[in-house]
Amino acid sequence: MKPIEFSIAGIGAWGAGFENWPQLQQLLSGEQFEAHTLKGPKPEIIPANERRRAPLPVRLAVEASWQATQASGYDAKDLSCVFVSGLGDTQLTDYMCKVLAGENKALSPTKFHNSVHNAAAGYWTISTGCMQAANSVAGFDNSVSLTLLEALIQADAEQRPMLITFYDAPSSQVLKELLKNEQSFAVSLVVVPSSLSKSKANLSISVDSEPGTWSQANWCVDLNNCYQTNPVARVLSLLALFAQGSGSSNSISMPLSEATSLTIQQLKS
Protein backbone atom coordinates (compact mmCIF):
# COMPACT_ATOMS: atom_id res chain seq x y z
CA MET A 1 0.00 0.00 0.00
CA LYS A 2 1.01 3.60 -0.51
CA PRO A 3 2.28 5.14 2.76
CA ILE A 4 -0.26 7.25 4.63
CA GLU A 5 1.22 10.39 6.17
CA PHE A 6 -0.37 11.93 9.23
CA SER A 7 0.13 14.10 12.29
CA ILE A 8 -0.97 13.64 15.89
CA ALA A 9 -2.91 16.72 16.99
CA GLY A 10 -3.77 15.65 20.53
CA ILE A 11 -2.97 12.90 23.03
CA GLY A 12 -4.80 11.76 26.14
CA ALA A 13 -3.54 9.18 28.64
CA TRP A 14 -4.47 7.54 31.92
CA GLY A 15 -2.84 4.61 33.68
CA ALA A 16 -1.51 3.25 36.94
CA GLY A 17 1.31 5.82 37.12
CA PHE A 18 0.04 8.75 35.05
CA GLU A 19 -3.08 10.85 34.60
CA ASN A 20 -2.29 12.61 31.31
CA TRP A 21 0.09 12.70 28.35
CA PRO A 22 2.72 15.01 29.93
CA GLN A 23 3.08 12.60 32.87
CA LEU A 24 3.31 9.58 30.57
CA GLN A 25 5.85 11.42 28.43
CA GLN A 26 8.03 11.90 31.51
CA LEU A 27 7.91 8.14 32.18
CA LEU A 28 8.91 7.44 28.58
CA SER A 29 11.89 9.75 29.04
CA GLY A 30 13.14 7.80 32.04
CA GLU A 31 11.41 9.15 35.15
CA GLN A 32 10.33 6.73 37.87
CA PHE A 33 6.89 5.19 38.07
CA GLU A 34 4.62 6.03 41.02
CA ALA A 35 1.51 3.88 41.25
CA HIS A 36 -1.90 5.49 41.71
CA THR A 37 -4.00 4.96 44.79
CA LEU A 38 -7.11 5.93 42.78
CA LYS A 39 -9.43 3.20 41.55
CA GLY A 40 -9.81 4.85 38.18
CA PRO A 41 -10.55 8.11 36.39
CA LYS A 42 -13.77 10.07 36.79
CA PRO A 43 -14.39 11.63 33.36
CA GLU A 44 -16.42 14.79 33.87
CA ILE A 45 -17.84 14.62 30.36
CA ILE A 46 -20.05 11.68 31.45
CA PRO A 47 -23.08 12.92 33.46
CA ALA A 48 -22.83 12.00 37.16
CA ASN A 49 -25.60 9.38 37.21
CA GLU A 50 -24.19 7.54 34.20
CA ARG A 51 -20.62 7.90 35.48
CA ARG A 52 -21.50 6.05 38.70
CA ARG A 53 -22.73 3.09 36.64
CA ALA A 54 -19.94 3.15 34.06
CA PRO A 55 -17.43 0.29 34.39
CA LEU A 56 -13.70 0.96 34.61
CA PRO A 57 -12.87 0.25 30.93
CA VAL A 58 -15.46 2.81 29.83
CA ARG A 59 -14.16 5.46 32.22
CA LEU A 60 -10.59 4.84 31.07
CA ALA A 61 -11.56 5.23 27.42
CA VAL A 62 -13.71 8.32 27.87
CA GLU A 63 -11.17 10.10 30.08
CA ALA A 64 -8.34 9.59 27.58
CA SER A 65 -10.60 10.55 24.66
CA TRP A 66 -11.69 13.77 26.32
CA GLN A 67 -8.10 14.75 27.09
CA ALA A 68 -7.05 14.12 23.48
CA THR A 69 -9.88 16.09 21.93
CA GLN A 70 -9.32 19.01 24.29
CA ALA A 71 -5.62 19.05 23.43
CA SER A 72 -6.28 18.81 19.69
CA GLY A 73 -8.49 21.87 19.35
CA TYR A 74 -11.12 19.84 17.47
CA ASP A 75 -14.72 19.54 18.62
CA ALA A 76 -15.51 16.01 19.80
CA LYS A 77 -18.81 16.15 17.90
CA ASP A 78 -16.92 16.44 14.61
CA LEU A 79 -14.60 13.45 15.01
CA SER A 80 -15.26 9.95 13.75
CA CYS A 81 -13.80 7.52 16.24
CA VAL A 82 -12.38 4.04 16.62
CA PHE A 83 -12.17 2.43 20.07
CA VAL A 84 -10.14 -0.70 20.77
CA SER A 85 -9.82 -3.03 23.73
CA GLY A 86 -7.68 -6.13 23.37
CA LEU A 87 -9.30 -7.95 26.30
CA GLY A 88 -12.77 -6.45 26.64
CA ASP A 89 -14.36 -6.07 30.06
CA THR A 90 -13.22 -9.27 31.75
CA GLN A 91 -14.88 -8.33 35.06
CA LEU A 92 -18.29 -8.26 33.36
CA THR A 93 -17.51 -11.38 31.34
CA ASP A 94 -16.66 -13.18 34.57
CA TYR A 95 -19.83 -11.89 36.25
CA MET A 96 -22.16 -12.96 33.44
CA CYS A 97 -20.61 -16.42 33.13
CA LYS A 98 -21.01 -17.01 36.88
CA VAL A 99 -24.63 -15.83 36.90
CA LEU A 100 -25.62 -17.83 33.83
CA ALA A 101 -23.96 -20.95 35.25
CA GLY A 102 -25.94 -20.64 38.50
CA GLU A 103 -29.54 -21.38 39.39
CA ASN A 104 -30.71 -17.76 39.33
CA LYS A 105 -29.88 -16.60 35.81
CA ALA A 106 -31.20 -13.05 36.22
CA LEU A 107 -28.51 -10.70 34.96
CA SER A 108 -28.29 -7.10 36.11
CA PRO A 109 -29.73 -5.02 33.24
CA THR A 110 -27.08 -2.33 33.80
CA LYS A 111 -24.22 -4.82 33.75
CA PHE A 112 -25.62 -6.54 30.67
CA HIS A 113 -25.95 -3.15 28.97
CA ASN A 114 -22.32 -2.36 29.81
CA SER A 115 -21.02 -5.76 28.66
CA VAL A 116 -21.18 -5.05 24.91
CA HIS A 117 -17.81 -4.38 23.27
CA ASN A 118 -18.89 -0.96 21.97
CA ALA A 119 -19.96 0.31 25.40
CA ALA A 120 -17.12 2.85 25.53
CA ALA A 121 -17.98 4.19 22.08
CA GLY A 122 -21.61 4.48 23.15
CA TYR A 123 -20.85 6.39 26.34
CA TRP A 124 -18.50 8.67 24.40
CA THR A 125 -20.83 9.53 21.53
CA ILE A 126 -23.82 10.09 23.83
CA SER A 127 -21.84 12.22 26.30
CA THR A 128 -20.33 14.43 23.59
CA GLY A 129 -23.30 14.50 21.21
CA CYS A 130 -21.15 12.97 18.49
CA MET A 131 -23.15 11.74 15.48
CA GLN A 132 -20.12 10.69 13.43
CA ALA A 133 -19.13 7.11 12.64
CA ALA A 134 -17.97 5.14 15.69
CA ASN A 135 -16.36 1.72 15.51
CA SER A 136 -15.11 -0.75 18.12
CA VAL A 137 -12.25 -3.16 17.45
CA ALA A 138 -10.70 -6.14 19.22
CA GLY A 139 -7.53 -7.88 18.10
CA PHE A 140 -5.96 -9.27 21.29
CA ASP A 141 -2.17 -8.88 21.03
CA ASN A 142 -2.37 -7.17 17.62
CA SER A 143 -5.09 -4.72 18.64
CA VAL A 144 -2.88 -1.64 18.32
CA SER A 145 -1.58 -2.31 14.81
CA LEU A 146 -4.96 -3.40 13.44
CA THR A 147 -6.69 -0.33 14.85
CA LEU A 148 -4.06 2.11 13.62
CA LEU A 149 -4.39 0.65 10.13
CA GLU A 150 -8.19 0.79 10.13
CA ALA A 151 -8.44 4.30 11.56
CA LEU A 152 -5.73 5.85 9.38
CA ILE A 153 -7.13 4.30 6.20
CA GLN A 154 -10.50 5.81 7.12
CA ALA A 155 -8.95 9.20 7.91
CA ASP A 156 -7.06 9.18 4.61
CA ALA A 157 -10.04 8.02 2.54
CA GLU A 158 -12.46 10.54 4.05
CA GLN A 159 -9.85 13.28 4.48
CA ARG A 160 -10.90 14.07 8.02
CA PRO A 161 -9.35 13.89 11.49
CA MET A 162 -10.04 10.78 13.58
CA LEU A 163 -10.11 9.91 17.26
CA ILE A 164 -8.42 6.60 18.13
CA THR A 165 -8.72 5.29 21.69
CA PHE A 166 -6.86 2.31 23.13
CA TYR A 167 -7.95 1.00 26.54
CA ASP A 168 -7.77 -2.12 28.72
CA ALA A 169 -8.44 -2.67 32.42
CA PRO A 170 -6.92 -5.33 34.73
CA SER A 171 -8.10 -8.87 34.08
CA SER A 172 -10.60 -10.45 36.46
CA GLN A 173 -9.08 -12.73 39.08
CA VAL A 174 -10.35 -15.94 37.50
CA LEU A 175 -8.88 -15.00 34.10
CA LYS A 176 -5.49 -13.70 35.26
CA GLU A 177 -3.75 -17.02 34.63
CA LEU A 178 -4.72 -16.70 30.96
CA LEU A 179 -4.82 -12.91 30.59
CA LYS A 180 -2.04 -11.65 32.85
CA ASN A 181 -2.80 -7.93 32.65
CA GLU A 182 -2.82 -6.25 36.08
CA GLN A 183 -2.69 -2.57 35.07
CA SER A 184 -5.18 -0.06 33.74
CA PHE A 185 -4.06 1.69 30.59
CA ALA A 186 -5.69 4.09 28.16
CA VAL A 187 -4.29 6.30 25.42
CA SER A 188 -6.21 8.36 22.91
CA LEU A 189 -4.92 10.05 19.76
CA VAL A 190 -6.45 12.62 17.44
CA VAL A 191 -4.81 11.90 14.09
CA VAL A 192 -4.94 14.25 11.11
CA PRO A 193 -4.20 13.40 7.44
CA SER A 194 -1.25 15.29 5.99
CA SER A 195 -3.49 17.32 3.67
CA LEU A 196 -5.39 18.77 6.65
CA SER A 197 -2.55 19.15 9.12
CA LYS A 198 -1.69 22.67 10.24
CA SER A 199 1.96 21.61 10.29
CA LYS A 200 4.02 19.18 8.24
CA ALA A 201 3.05 15.52 8.75
CA ASN A 202 5.56 13.84 11.05
CA LEU A 203 4.58 10.16 10.78
CA SER A 204 3.61 7.66 8.11
CA ILE A 205 2.31 4.09 8.06
CA SER A 206 2.68 1.37 5.47
CA VAL A 207 1.97 -2.36 5.28
CA ASP A 208 4.83 -4.77 4.59
CA SER A 209 4.45 -8.34 3.33
CA GLU A 210 6.73 -9.82 5.96
CA PRO A 211 6.29 -10.64 9.66
CA GLY A 212 6.92 -7.93 12.23
CA THR A 213 7.94 -7.96 15.88
CA TRP A 214 7.03 -5.61 18.68
CA SER A 215 9.71 -3.15 19.79
CA GLN A 216 11.61 -3.98 22.96
CA ALA A 217 10.44 -2.08 26.03
CA ASN A 218 13.17 0.11 27.51
CA TRP A 219 11.47 2.19 30.19
CA CYS A 220 10.89 1.83 33.93
CA VAL A 221 10.02 -1.66 35.19
CA ASP A 222 6.31 -0.99 35.72
CA LEU A 223 5.81 0.58 32.31
CA ASN A 224 7.73 -2.29 30.71
CA ASN A 225 5.47 -4.81 32.47
CA CYS A 226 2.38 -2.97 31.29
CA TYR A 227 3.74 -2.99 27.72
CA GLN A 228 4.23 -6.75 27.89
CA THR A 229 0.91 -7.77 29.48
CA ASN A 230 -1.65 -5.13 28.46
CA PRO A 231 -2.40 -5.54 24.72
CA VAL A 232 -3.21 -1.89 24.04
CA ALA A 233 -0.12 -0.66 25.92
CA ARG A 234 1.83 -1.68 22.80
CA VAL A 235 0.90 1.79 21.55
CA LEU A 236 3.71 3.00 23.82
CA SER A 237 6.17 2.16 21.03
CA LEU A 238 4.38 4.66 18.76
CA LEU A 239 4.31 7.30 21.50
CA ALA A 240 8.02 6.82 22.18
CA LEU A 241 8.71 7.30 18.46
CA PHE A 242 6.49 10.39 18.35
CA ALA A 243 8.18 11.86 21.43
CA GLN A 244 11.53 11.79 19.64
CA GLY A 245 10.34 14.67 17.45
CA SER A 246 10.75 15.15 13.72
CA GLY A 247 14.52 15.50 13.71
CA SER A 248 15.10 11.80 13.13
CA SER A 249 13.98 9.19 10.60
CA ASN A 250 13.53 6.25 12.97
CA SER A 251 10.85 3.63 12.42
CA ILE A 252 9.11 0.82 14.27
CA SER A 253 7.39 -2.34 13.10
CA MET A 254 4.22 -3.90 14.50
CA PRO A 255 2.81 -7.36 13.68
CA LEU A 256 -0.47 -7.35 11.74
CA SER A 257 -0.69 -11.07 11.03
CA GLU A 258 1.65 -14.03 10.72
CA ALA A 259 2.78 -12.78 7.30
CA THR A 260 2.34 -8.99 7.41
CA SER A 261 3.44 -6.05 9.51
CA LEU A 262 2.73 -2.35 9.96
CA THR A 263 5.69 0.02 9.67
CA ILE A 264 5.48 3.45 11.29
CA GLN A 265 8.08 5.91 10.08
CA GLN A 266 9.18 9.14 11.75
CA LEU A 267 9.42 11.74 8.96
CA LYS A 268 12.16 14.33 8.97
CA SER A 269 11.04 17.94 9.13
Language model regions located:
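Conserved "HGTGT" condensation-loop signature of ketosynthase/thiolase-family condensing enzymes
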Residues: 1-117, 121-133, 166-269
